Amino acid sequence: MKLKIVAVVVTGLLAANVAHAAEVYNKDGNKLDLYGKVTALRYFTDDKRDDGDKTYARLGFKGETQINDQMIGFGHWEYDFKGYNDEANGSRGKNL
């Protein structure tokens, strides 16, 4: 019985962090990729600053374009959505 519980816990921990990526467009030297990640976190501690839900999701785009034979232009945008914010605070994130 205890072995089954350990197997369920290990499986749950491995599934708590999921990331995916997909190529949206790739033609004539122009490429656009979409990627994302979801991480489910919960900290149990006596420190009030670190205790609680720290779940977040990340969404991003990467792009490339062939300018000429020797030069490639690229761009990158990424945003973090915090799952533990209440509605009054809104979502906080970062752009890179």
From Swiss-Prot:
Keyword annotations: Signal
Pfam families: Porin_1
Coiled coil segments of this chain: none
Record InterPro entries: Gram-neg_bact_OMP, Porin_dom_sf, Porin_gammaproteobac, Porin_Gram-ve
SUPFAM superfamilies (alphabetical): Porins
GO cellular component: cell outer membrane
Gene Ontology molecular functions: porin activity
Signal peptide region: 1-21
Keyword match Signal: yes
Superkingdom of origin: Bacteria
Keyword flag Disulfide bond: no
GO biological process, one term: monoatomic ion transmembrane transport
Note: May be missing up to 300 C-terminal residues compared to other porins.
PANTHER family hit by this protein: OUTER MEMBRANE PORIN F-RELATED, PROTEIN YDDL-RELATED
Protein name, per record: Protein YddL
Protein species of origin: Escherichia coli (strain K12)
Gene from which the chain derives: yddL
